[in-house]
Amino acid sequence: MSTGTPFLSTADIAHILQWRGLGPCLRGLMEALRADFMRWEDFDKSARVAHHSPVGVIELMPISDGRTYAFKYVNGHPGNTALGLSTVMAFGGLASVTTGEPQLISELTLCTALRTAATSVLAASVLARPDSRCMALIGNGAQSEF
């Protein structure tokens, strides 16, 4: 019997970052990403499902490795700043493929920013020249303006 689906909030993630430290967290994310990229073929990758409207977009991004099923819901609404809201917000879920039982619900706005940073470092470690000392990033995600 389930004891309830855990929810990971922005405050929970901030607490983990303070407790563990940003560097160790990013290194852990980078290694998890590296491990997942090494098993790329194991994932059933589906195209994102998008709903476009005059005021923004809402996207659903599903993926599964046959053991777990995950999704990310993310929006992009440029006019939200006039309402005192973020222009980009995200959350997601993780479930068992075997039982369908939800295993985790999480905010993913902050998580996506952390994932982007870890992916950038991972890509640079693989693609940069060995003598490189700096890197420039041009982004078009939550940190950018519409």
Task: State where each predicted segment sits.
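N-terminal ligand-binding/catalytic initiation module
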Residues: M1-A113, T119-V121, A128-D131
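Charged, low-complexity, helix-prone segments enriched in Lys/Glu/Asp/Gln
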Residues: L114-R115, S144
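Glycine-rich adenosine-cofactor-binding loop
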Residues: S120, D131-F146
